Amino acid sequence: MRQFLLLGVFFCSLVLLACTSAKSETKELQMVPLENAEVERVYGLYQQGDYAAYVAEMASCDNAPESYRKQMADLHKQHAMLQQEKMGGVASASVVKLTPSADGRQTNVILRVNYRNQTHEEILLSFVWVKDRWRLR
């Protein structure tokens, strides 16, 4: 009886180990590298004036109250208005460089923003892999 019990515990442990290792491999396979098109889509929300949607892309705001998210959207709107006054607004934006972290779960993006007054700047956006998709940090 005791041998049967030990054999049962061993078998259950083996099955549990197999299930947990298979699950982590599945998650690894699902993560895709960040692509330029996704960065441009997210920055396009800002560029088009959809500040609430831009803030919704921020993983850091997921658990924030709605009032905080509204403040963040208002801050981005104010920043865009300043860009409009000083530089005529954003004409275009393009990805210069994607730098993934060692584990691939975070990517720093250098984005070149061209303004209507013929000036430009390079900005850094940080993206993180959260819940099976890329989000602004």
Name these PLM-found stretches.
Residues 7-16:
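Bacterial N-terminal signal peptides
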Residues 19-48:
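Short, low-complexity N-terminal intrinsically disordered segments enriched in polar/charged residues
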Residues 6, 46-51:
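Short, compositionally biased low-complexity segments
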Residues 36-40, 52-102:
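Short solvent-exposed beta->alpha transition segments
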Residues 92-137:
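Exposed beta-sheet edge and beta->alpha loop/turn motif
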Residues 1-4:
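Positively charged n-region of N-terminal signal peptides that target proteins for export
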